[in-house]
């Protein structure tokens, strides 16, 4: 049976950081030491880690980072969750772990009234679309401190009255 945990970054333990780093390194091979360093230096204390466990092993993971965006040249900054580092162990794919992690993220997004943004390659866009994520057209957003040629998708944000979103990672 798969169990899921949500852990604030300030409460994450070293053994969990190591397990996450090993899982991430199975897909993004930068070395476990670099994965740990990246995880430590690119998260804030209130960011969330969503973990999927099979027995005591982490088999799925995503980091929900709390970031800011601006709508329509307004000065008011709005929070969003950056859906980052999403991975499911190769041996546990096709058993809905990824979908369940996303359901947990969506529930959190709704309860806190904070949208989710994610950057993805076109090849995985259909997966997110099935889970009610919407594409934000390139003309509707500007990444202030990040370059990316893939797609930006969102969940839980009405784009009707938005002409431009400025996003700071």
For each of these PLM feature ranges, what is it?
Residues 1-15, 161-168:
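Conserved N-terminal entry element of GNAT/NAT acetyltransferase domains
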Residues 129, 134-152:
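Conserved catalytic-core motifs of GNAT/GCN5-like acyltransferases
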Residues 108-121:
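Conserved GNAT acetyl-CoA-binding A-motif
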Residues 6, 58, 135-137:
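Residue-level detector of beta-propeller blades
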Residues 98-102, 123-124, 140-147:
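Short glycine/proline-centered loop/turn elements that form peptide/ligand docking sites
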Residues 88, 94-107:
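Conserved acetyl-CoA-binding loop-helix of GNAT-fold acetyltransferases
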Residues 146-169:
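Acidic/histidine-enriched, glycine/proline-rich intrinsically disordered or flexible terminal extensions
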